[in-house]
Amino acid sequence: MEDKKYKIADLQEKSEEWKIPFSNLLAGFVLEEFMLRFSASEFKNRFLLRNGTVLGLEQYRKKNILKLDFFCEPDERIPEKLLQLYLQKKEQSPVRWKGTISSQQAGTCLELQGQFEEMKVPVTVGIHFMHLGKIWGLVESCLLY
């Protein structure tokens, strides 16, 4: 979203205009704010989003899926650094973050809460460790044919 101070009233107006339930649009807004900060970070080239279809107006009209799943090169330090990125207050960001980290079988899980004004949205970020070269090879071979 463009560089603007957003208010709840702005989302309510867009909710009516786009015919999206307000709670769904709020959740989508928080997810997209997560991705906006992520895309401007040092991590943007070290992760591959597995479930990008959870983003976008059509998905918000149907149902919100508040889990983002990423593949990431194996590095146990990255999830903690990523969590710290979100816990830092950014003046230009309308969303404030709180969160915790936990280890999973093949990766890590961040349990975040994005707060926009007084409203809170839970967001789960799954980080699955995998050598991305294998995945990029599959993606490239699919694009060639």
Label the predicted regions.
Residues 1-145:
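Compositionally biased terminal segments of proteins
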